[in-house]
């Protein structure tokens, strides 16, 4: 079972495609800098840690003005 759950993650970011993009971008940043903001991450992989950051509301997404205007 996925921890955090997809349902709790989709309450933070409304689109699963945006969720994947944000988590992947943050995971790449973590691979380069090796910095996780969550104190005791459950996952040992960067993507899992990024999802935990989103679930803890440490990492969020603000849509760009171009996407809002459409």
Curated annotation (Swiss-Prot):
**Gene name as annotated:** rpoZ
Write down the species.
Answer: Bacillus cereus (strain G9842)
Which superkingdom is the protein from?
Bacteria
Sorted alphabetically, which Gene3D superfamilies does this protein's record hold?
Answer: 3.90.940.10
Q: State the UniProt keywords alphabetically.
A: DNA-directed RNA polymerase, Nucleotidyltransferase, Transcription, Transferase
Q: Which PANTHER family match?
A: DNA-DIRECTED RNA POLYMERASE SUBUNIT OMEGA
GO CC field: DNA-directed RNA polymerase complex
Role, per record: Promotes RNA polymerase assembly. Latches the N- and C-terminal regions of the beta' subunit thereby facilitating its interaction with the beta and alpha subunits.
| Quaternary structure, from the entry | The RNAP catalytic core consists of 2 alpha, 1 beta, 1 beta' and 1 omega subunit. When a sigma factor is associated with the core the holoenzyme is formed, which can initiate transcription.
Give me the reactions it catalyses.
RNA(n) + a ribonucleoside 5'-triphosphate = RNA(n+1) + diphosphate
EC assignment: 2.7.7.6
For this UniProt entry, the molecular function terms from Gene Ontology, in alphabetical order, are: DNA binding; DNA-directed RNA polymerase activity
By its UniProt entry, which InterPro entries does this protein fall under? Answer: DNA-dir_RNA_pol_omega, Pol_omega/Rpo6/RPB6, RPB6/omega-like_sf
Q: Does the keyword Chloroplast apply?
A: no
- What Pfam families does this protein map onto? RNA_pol_Rpb6
* Record-linked SMART domains: RNA_pol_Rpb6
* Family, as annotated: Belongs to the RNA polymerase subunit omega family.
GO terms (BP aspect): DNA-templated transcription
Enzyme class label: transferase
Q: State the name under which the record lists this protein.
A: DNA-directed RNA polymerase subunit omega
């Amino acid at each position: 079972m996925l921890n955090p759950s997809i349902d709790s993650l989709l309450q933070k970011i409304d689109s699963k495609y945006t969720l994947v993009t944000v988590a992947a971008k943050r995971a790449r940043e973590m691979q380069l800098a090796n910095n996780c903001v969550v104190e005791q991450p459950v996952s040992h992989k960067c993507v899992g840690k990024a999802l935990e950051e989103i679930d803890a509301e440490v990492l969020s997404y603000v849509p760009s003005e171009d996407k809002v205007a459409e």
